């Protein structure tokens, strides 16, 4: 294991979900909000958007903390050629879940880690295919009322009741669907002072 350092590990996110995930690794870290424009660019697909936003968040925090390790991440969801964002309202969540029911949605969980040692970025994007059950309007409204997934891409929380919406999940990293791909993160942190084991 590399020796400890005076550098900090900073998660470029205020997401309680991602913070809880990072805590699983038992690493000391702080958070910093990376307020950026998260609009989708013309011609950009869901994966490109997630990768770009994760990198932009990382670089924004790295400008202020050039001697620290920075973890940036972003997640988007794609249904055919439609990018599903955070719904923000119950009606938008309802419409998203109606679109998703009985279909497969691909989630892109992008990770970008900045290393102060060599000023390099390590980037990764994990795909997760989620097949939704057939759902009726009543089931969808009940779910939204019970879990209020208004701040989640795709309008569900897979770590909670949202799992009941699914028929199956396919991914190389089961943690990615929550928002922070921990397997890729552990790989990125190898040979750093923040190697988990």
Swiss-Prot record:
Please cite one Gene Ontology biological process associated with this protein.
Answer: nucleotide metabolic process
Concerning CDD domains, the annotation shows:
Maf
Record's catalysed reaction(s): N(7)-methyl-GTP + H2O = N(7)-methyl-GMP + diphosphate + H(+)
Look up the record and name the cofactor or cofactors this protein needs: a divalent metal cation
Record key words, sorted: Cytoplasm, Hydrolase, Nucleotide metabolism
- Detail the disulphide connectivity of this chain as listed in its UniProt entry: none
Pfam families given in the database record: Maf (PF02545)
Write the Enzyme Commission number(s) for this entry: 3.6.1.-
Query: Which InterPro entries does the entry mention?
Result: ITPase-like_fam (IPR029001), Maf-like (IPR003697)
Q: Which domain of life is it from?
A: Bacteria
Q: Which residues form the active site?
A: 74
Task: Tell me the protein's name.
Answer: 7-methyl-GTP pyrophosphatase
């Amino acid at each position: 294991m590399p020796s400890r350092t005076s550098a900090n590990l900073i998660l470029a996110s205020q997401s309680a979900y991602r913070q809880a995930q990072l805590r699983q690794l038992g690493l000391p870290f702080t958070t910093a909000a990376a307020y950026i424009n998260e609009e989708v660019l013309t011609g950009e697909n869901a994966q490109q958007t997630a990768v770009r936003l994760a990198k932009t968040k990382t670089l924004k925090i790295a400008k202020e903390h050039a001697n620290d390790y920075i973890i940036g991440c972003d997640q988007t969801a794609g249904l055919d050629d439609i990018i599903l964002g955070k719904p923000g309202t119950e009606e938008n969540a309802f419409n998203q879940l109606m679109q998703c029911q009985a279909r497969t949605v691909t989630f892109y969980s992008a990770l970008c880690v900045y290393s102060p040692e060599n000023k390099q970025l390590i980037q990764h994007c994990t795909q997760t295919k989620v097949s939704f059950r057939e759902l009726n309007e009543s089931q969808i409204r009940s779910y939204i009322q019970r879990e209020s997934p208004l701040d989640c891409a795709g309008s569900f929380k897979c770590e909670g009741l949202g799992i009941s919406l699914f028929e199956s999940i396919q991914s190389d990293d089961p943690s990615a669907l929550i928002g922070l791909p921990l397997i890729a993160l552990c790989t990125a942190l190898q040979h750093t002072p923040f190697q988990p084991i």
